[in-house]
């Protein structure tokens, strides 16, 4: 089974949230990358402040580790309100959400992570709260039960999810602002690593930061995690300064190659090439070949490989690309390109 503590996993682990909080930007002016999102949010937040209104409810989605929680914190700071944080799986009962909402003050931001995992009962409570700033709750049981309405102060709900497709239409339609976070460029990640190093008091050369950024899979959380591990290596094996050579040696020791792939990524690609002739192969067969769950392949391993052009999904199954063969120095079959063309819909 997959190692839950993969160093290139975009999900937070252990004390990581606390460590990331120390280097997290607090205002849009400090926010690096995502230029379209930053520009739009500057306008939306500025307009809401001019009108002295709460910002429209905002849905933020994208792969893990790209800064959804960071954006929620920035929204709260820019709007001058407090941030109340929870997550979908924690809100089991309607009363859990009601308790949170009745403590909100005007201008506060309620951040619900993994909002796609809300129970239907809790989701129903959200609808009038989002639309009319009213809370409908039931008091009592059986024939004596009665419904009461509580007025809520104007607030902003920020929902975050890695799987926007699992949101119900009624919930999704109630968000006035929807933002998708994309993978970061190496240039933006280099700036993020440099900023984190300065805030953490880590001595680092520009080339060292760029080497870390190149292998961070377009994800700030991974970049900051790699920075901490390379810092450890530099202090023990070097003079404490992160150079390109130190970063390269440290990341090679951590089994993170120049594309940011770890042993699990390489294992999947090699199985596809060596056991299935490059594909096409069904995801269930591929999962069995590497002893992994289908969901792990689809949600954890595949997205970055597809985004980098090493794997494609076709109606007939998964296929390795020319990039995958080149990565391992394996000669691709001559029919590879035509086979991929034939597997694409409408071709």
UniProtKB/Swiss-Prot annotation:
Record keyword ATP-binding present: yes
Kindly list the positions annotated as binding Mg(2+). 69
Which residue ranges run through the membrane?
Answer: none
Identify the residues that bind DNA.
294, 313, 318
Localization terms from the record: Cytoplasm
Tell me yes or no: is Cytoplasm among this UniProt entry's keywords.
yes
Q: Name one GO biological process term.
A: DNA repair
Which EC class is the enzyme in?
A: hydrolase
Looking up InterPro entries in the UniProt record yields:
AAA+_ATPase, AAA_lid_4, DNA_helicase_Holl-junc_RuvB, P-loop_NTPase, RuvB-like_N, RuvB_C, WH-like_DNA-bd_sf, WH_DNA-bd_sf
Query: Region Head domain (RuvB-H): start and end of each range?
Result: 258-347
In which residues is ATP bound?
24, 65, 68-70, 131-133, 174, 184, 221
Region Small ATPAse domain (RuvB-S): list its residue ranges. 185-255
Instruction: List the residue ranges of the region (Large ATPase domain (RuvB-L)).
Output: 4-184
The record's annotation in SMART domains points to:
AAA (SM00382)
Q: Which HAMAP family match?
A: DNA_HJ_migration_RuvB (MF_00016)
Quote the record's domain comment.
Answer: Has 3 domains, the large (RuvB-L) and small ATPase (RuvB-S) domains and the C-terminal head (RuvB-H) domain. The head domain binds DNA, while the ATPase domains jointly bind ATP, ADP or are empty depending on the state of the subunit in the translocation cycle. During a single DNA translocation step the structure of each domain remains the same, but their relative positions change.
Q: How does it assemble?
A: Homohexamer. Forms an RuvA(8)-RuvB(12)-Holliday junction (HJ) complex. HJ DNA is sandwiched between 2 RuvA tetramers; dsDNA enters through RuvA and exits via RuvB. An RuvB hexamer assembles on each DNA strand where it exits the tetramer. Each RuvB hexamer is contacted by two RuvA subunits (via domain III) on 2 adjacent RuvB subunits; this complex drives branch migration. In the full resolvosome a probable DNA-RuvA(4)-RuvB(12)-RuvC(2) complex forms which resolves the HJ.
Protein name (database record): Holliday junction branch migration complex subunit RuvB
UniProt organism field: Teredinibacter turnerae (strain ATCC 39867 / T7901)
Give the lineage. Bacteria, Pseudomonadati, Pseudomonadota, Gammaproteobacteria, Cellvibrionales
């Amino acid at each position: 089974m997959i190692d839950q503590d993969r160093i290139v996993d975009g999900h937070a682990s252990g004390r990581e949230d606390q460590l990331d909080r120390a280097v997290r930007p607090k205002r849009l002016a400090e926010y690096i990358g995502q230029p379209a999102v930053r520009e739009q949010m500057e306008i939306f937040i500025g307009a809401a402040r001019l009108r002295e209104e709460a910002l429209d409810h905002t849905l933020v989605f994208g792969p893990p580790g790209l800064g959804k929680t960071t954006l929620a914190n920035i929204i709260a700071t820019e709007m001058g309100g407090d941030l109340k944080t929870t997550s979908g799986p924690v809100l089991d009962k309607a009363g859990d959400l009601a308790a949170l909402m009745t403590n909100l003050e005007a201008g506060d931001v309620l951040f619900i992570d993994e909002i796609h995992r809300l129970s239907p009962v809790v989701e129903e409570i959200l609808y009038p709260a989002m639309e009319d700033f009213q809370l409908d709750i039931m008091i009592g049981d059986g024939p004596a039960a009665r419904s009461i309405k509580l007025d809520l102060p104007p607030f902003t709900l920020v929902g975050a999810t890695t799987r926007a497709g699992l949101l119900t239409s009624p919930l999704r339609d109630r968000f006035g602002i929807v933002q998708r976070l994309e993978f970061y460029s190496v240039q933006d990640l280099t700036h993020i690593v440099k900023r984190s190093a300065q805030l953490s008091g880590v001595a680092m050369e520009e080339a060292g930061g760029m080497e870390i950024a190149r292998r961070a899979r377009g994800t700030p959380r991974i970049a900051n995690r790699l920075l901490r591990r390379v810092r450890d290596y530099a202090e023990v094996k070097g003079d404490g300064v992160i150079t390109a050579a130190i970063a390269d040696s440290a990341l090679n020791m951590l089994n993170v190659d120049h594309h940011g792939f770890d042993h699990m990524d390489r294992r999947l690609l090699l199985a596809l090439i060596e056991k299935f002739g490059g594909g096409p192969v069904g995801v269930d067969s591929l999962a069995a070949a590497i002893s992994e769950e289908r969901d792990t392949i689809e949600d954890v391993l595949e997205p970055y490989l597809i985004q980098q052009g090493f794997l494609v999904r076709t109606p007939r199954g998964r296929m390795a690309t020319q990039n995958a063969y080149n990565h391992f120095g394996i000669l691709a079959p001559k029919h590879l390109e035509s086979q991929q063309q034939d597997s694409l819909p409408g071709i």
